[in-house]
């Protein structure tokens, strides 16, 4: 099973990806986690990414694509994986398609979680409150200004992926406003 999760920030992609990976015993591939991993292992790509991040810039698509390609080659991905946070653009989706084809693989589904923007803001506030309540570290991008920027970026860059994957017959749209367990039930139904 090879799956991509799409949805705006706060839509529950990470939660649903985690639930799916636990049930099917396949890895969840998060670009943030993959970046941190290659940086900590001090690989060549990791050193490049670290230098870019330390300079305050965004890691280029070519580096992210290389990291994803390398990660998909690892043995735990033989039976599948769930991509969370990648691809973010149509360009990355096209590269992912090439990467998978070169490995004689293809995506089984792209799951898009649809959530009302007001609900997204409420979810972000709740996440901040819950993090503070347990003495955790609040994410630097969990504030109104940063969150609004992330939503704009999602609309401009990531939302066009819906059309890209719909045209390829891969898109499965799920109402992300339902309870977490109900969303999970609907998603699992795609793979029965």
Curated annotation (Swiss-Prot):
Keyword Cytoplasm appears in the UniProt entry: yes
Which residues make up the binding site for AMP? 31, 36, 57-59, 85-88, 92, 139, 150
Q: Which reaction does it catalyse?
A: AMP + ATP = 2 ADP
Positions annotated to bind ATP? 10-15, 127, 178
* One Pfam entry name: ADK
Describe the function of this protein: Catalyzes the reversible transfer of the terminal phosphate group between ATP and AMP. Plays an important role in cellular energy homeostasis and in adenine nucleotide metabolism.
| NCBIfam families tied to this protein | adk (TIGR01351), PRK00279.1-3 (NF001381), PRK14527.1 (NF011100), PRK14531.1 (NF011104), PRK14532.1 (NF011105)
**HAMAP family given in the database record:** Adenylate_kinase_Adk
Q: Which family does it belong to?
A: Belongs to the adenylate kinase family.
Q: What is known of its domains?
A: Consists of three domains, a large central CORE domain and two small peripheral domains, NMPbind and LID, which undergo movements during catalysis. The LID domain closes over the site of phosphoryl transfer upon ATP binding. Assembling and dissambling the active center during each catalytic cycle provides an effective means to prevent ATP hydrolysis.
Can you name this protein?
Answer: Adenylate kinase
Provide the species name: Bartonella quintana (strain Toulouse) (Rochalimaea quintana)
């Amino acid at each position: 099973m090879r799956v991509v999760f799409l949805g705006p920030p706060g839509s529950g992609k990470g939660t649903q990806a985690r639930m799916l990976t636990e049930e099917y015993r396949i890895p969840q591939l998060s670009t943030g986690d993959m970046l941190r991993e290659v940086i900590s292992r001090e690989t060549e790509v990791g050193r490049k990414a670290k230098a870019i991040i330390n300079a305050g810039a965004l890691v280029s698509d070519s580096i992210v694509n290389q990291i994803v390609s390398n990660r998909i080659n690892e043995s735990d991905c033989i039976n599948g994986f769930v991509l969370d946070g990648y691809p973010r653009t149509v360009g990355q989706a096209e590269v992912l398609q090439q990467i998978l084809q070169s490995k004689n693989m293809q995506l089984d589904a792209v799951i898009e979680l649809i959530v009302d923007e007001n609900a997204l803001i409420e979810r972000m506030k709740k996440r901040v409150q819950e993090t503070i309540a347990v003495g955790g570290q609040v994410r630097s991008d969990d504030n109104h200004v940063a969150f609004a920027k992330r939503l704009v970026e999602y609309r401009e860059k990531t939302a066009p992926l819906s059309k890209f994957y719909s045209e390829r017959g891969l898109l499965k749209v799920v109402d992300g406003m339902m309870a977490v367990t109900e969303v999970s039930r609907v998603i699992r139904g795609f793979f029965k």
